């Protein structure tokens, strides 16, 4: 019996030793995140998406705002700018009602909302009469303001009456909400009404309509000048005045306006940051001059109301 007890004790002792020697396998480890996933996560954490800055209004100003949007979003992580057209009067109405944060316009704010809005003049742009290109107006490179007024009021109906050949004139207007229409009408028509006819809601669509319509004429910001259209200079007492930057800056070419970005009250937050970016000397001197048709306000040697 004693021998049996000793044997059992030895067996238990041996089993314990064996059990102690069996080290449990290491717990499985999660695979480390890939470098690209980690970098992407860090970038997203560092650049949270912000509430978009909403802008509507002038199609004449849209090319400049789109250029600013592209540069700004590329250099300001998380920034988002949403731009739509519709005309200057729509932009003013939208910002006054709170539908958007910024209203773009070629014209000053009307008296009924002027007290609510803060004006940021971001550029100057010129306007010109532009026409469908053809043999009928090949020799018509310039018209006087008087001749333009006669065309757009409907008094002159054929290109032969202004130095061209026999071809009916088709006037295509911008819609009543257009700032381009308001600026051109105030300077050229002096308060007279445009002749009734076809209309287009935005400048881009108008360019295409002019290309397709024989004998057509309209008015556009120089930011929409197109080699497939005739851009008409002005005839003045001293000769022909081309719509160049130099002539606009000096005031020799009179058909121009300030480009406004209106906010309801003082700009703040993301909208303020975007407008401030457009007004920086760097943008005004290096980016703005590369966008066709626009001139920094600081380059103007003359001023005007509106």
Language-model regions: role of each:
Residues 7-8, 23:
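Intrinsic disorder/low-complexity detector
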Residues 15-19:
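C-terminal motif of bacterial Sec signal peptides marking the signal peptidase cleavage site
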Residues 1-7:
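Bacterial N-terminal signal peptides that target proteins for export
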Residues 21-97, 105-306:
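Exported/periplasmic ABC-transporter solute-binding proteins
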